[in-house]
Amino acid sequence: MASLHLGLSSIPRPSFRPTCNLIIRCSAERQALFNRIAPVYDNLNDLLSLGQHRIWKRMAISWSGAKEGDNALDICCGSGDLTFLLSERVGPRGKAVGLDFSNEQLLIASTRQKLRSKTCYKNIKWMEGNALELPFPDSSFDAVTIGYGLRNVVDRHKAMAEICRVLKPGSMVSVLDFNKSINPLSTAIQELMIDNIVVSVASGYGLENEYKYLKSSIKDFLTGNELEKLALEVGFSNAKHFEIGFGFMGNLVAIR
């Protein structure tokens, strides 16, 4: 029977970095934000992407290299979309772990699991945890995914280093997120859509301020080239970023 473990700290412990207090405060604020949007998160994803996010997520799973019998990890799993797809890939003989720092998102994921009948979904374990301090030994997983999560962590270098640490040599991580384009026109169109469509729709759910955060988070994110360099810096042997969704989305694939 699948389990829901909620005993892990979801706020980073102080580190040697001089900005550790700021990191803790920002992490707590982001955790609270995702708890607030949890009840309508799935509906908004479908509405705002016209269902296209499901295609992008299947592409991300394919790029992860997960296969039958594998031990796979989905970081920043939210309500579990990628975790369920990973579970289908690894099958009943494999294992899938969905980790997130939002208790509310995990409760929704666990509820969704109980309503689904596929045998493979019994191999899923939900955990509340911190992407900056993954609670797993080195070389634990055959595949890792992170969807729309790396952009939201407060220390991307540490998060990628942790992913590299828990992956087995030769295994891959697939990182799906909004694409920070270097094309001024693409950036302008993306921001226009966020301001006039995304925020407008979210305001109907009382979440205008929460989704205004999206534009600033993309501005603060890394370009495809920067993501590739980051992956190599933390120890991955190879990395390639792909633009998808008309260039508005991106997927980094990195090999341990």
Indicate where each model-derived feature is located:
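A short glycine-rich, Lys/Arg-flanked "PGG" loop and its adjoining helix->strand segment in the class I
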Residues: 157-172
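Core SAM-dependent methyltransferase catalytic element
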Residues: 234-256
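C-terminal alpha-helical "lid/dimerization" subdomain adjacent to the S-adenosyl-L-methionine
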Residues: 28, 118-120, 176-234, 240
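Class I SAM-dependent methyltransferase SAM/SAH-binding core
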Residues: 71-134
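Class I SAM-dependent methyltransferase Rossmann-like catalytic core
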Residues: 38-52
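A short SAM/SAH-binding and catalytic strip from SAM-dependent methyltransferases
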Residues: 142-156, 179
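Conserved alpha-helix/loop element of class I SAM-dependent methyltransferases that forms part
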Residues: 50-71, 81, 85
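N-terminal, positively charged/glycine-rich alpha-helical extensions of SAM-dependent methyltransferases
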Residues: 2, 10-42
